Curated annotation (Swiss-Prot):
The name this protein goes by in its record: UDP-N-acetylglucosamine--N-acetylmuramyl-(pentapeptide) pyrophosphoryl-undecaprenol N-acetylglucosamine transferase
Signal peptide extent: none
Top-rank EC class of the record's enzyme: transferase
Keyword Transferase: yes
Gene Ontology biological process terms from the UniProt entry: carbohydrate metabolic process; cell division; cell wall organization; lipid glycosylation; peptidoglycan biosynthetic process; regulation of cell shape
GN (gene name): murG
Main location: membrane
Lineage top rank: taxon: Bacteria
Amino acid sequence: MKVAISGGGTGGHVYPALALIRELKKIHPEAEFLYIGTEKGLEAGIVKREGIPFEAIEITGFKRSLSLENIKTVMRFLSGAKKSKQILRDFKPDVVIGTGGYVCGPVVYAAAKLKIPTLIHEQNSVAGLTNKFLSRYTDKVAICFEEVSDSFASEKIVFTGNPRASEVVGVDSEGALETYGLVSGKPTVLVFGGSRGARGVNEAVEAILPEWNNRDFQLLYVTGDVHYEKIKDSLAELNLGNHISVQPFIYDMPKILNAVTLVVSRAGATTLAELTALGVPSILIPSPYVTANHQENNARALEKNNAAIVITEAELKNTDLMATVDSILNDEAKLNGMKLSAKQMGRPDAAAKLVEAVLSIMK
């Protein structure tokens, strides 16, 4: 069995692809994989570190507005599709899967033209431009949010969820909090703004740290590498208690997510898949800097189901974040209700469901 996968630009497209590969390997340990991405995207480093064969093509994304740059992008797309055809002819995959990002455009398009079975995976509640385009050519479209179903032909849709969800379920959290100087068994809030951190989230948290010093519940505050030194210096005079741990980055996030009580974070699709799979309540602060405002749409889906409270970045300055945290952690009925609602939205079997969809289209 040979599988070619393409997706990139951000971790939100790459990590689901890797989760799918791992799940396929469980069922077909003899399977061969080829990952097609760009050398400039996040995927180049991540995929190579995983030891998965990697081929690169050159492609850039389309602008949503009319632009001369889009003419160049069309030329790059055609060139990328031509190279993709050659790569696919050489590898001879049984199926080609796209997990989003502009790089999978020419790859999945080329596969469809070569009559190779194809599937695309849309992680967000708003369809990406590339997936919208590719859906005309693919055999199946796997989705994670019901809200996005109107963007694709109904006969092609299969609701699988995000395969990253499966990778956090059942992870042993023993000693996870102790690694960061905290104590197991105490109510703990995790705050993070994505892999690089988020200035808006950091500013809101810094403003309430003096108040947090007087709370009983613990805080694991992840600033992001690029913000850490500056924030560390600014907090030096606060004399924070041992129940507050400030870190630049978390490398064992699945373990930590299994150990915390509440999460304050951005609303990327992968993060939400993990939170709902575990039934972790959240306060979501969607990034306003993403295509089609898809993070807010993702977050509103959880809010609608009482699994999260949403605060937009524009609302942060006029919102008492500490009071919002208090309102959840000091109300056991509310906390448990949000846990249950999040859990009901979760798809812990997402990886298996996606594999099932992939196998269903293979000749």
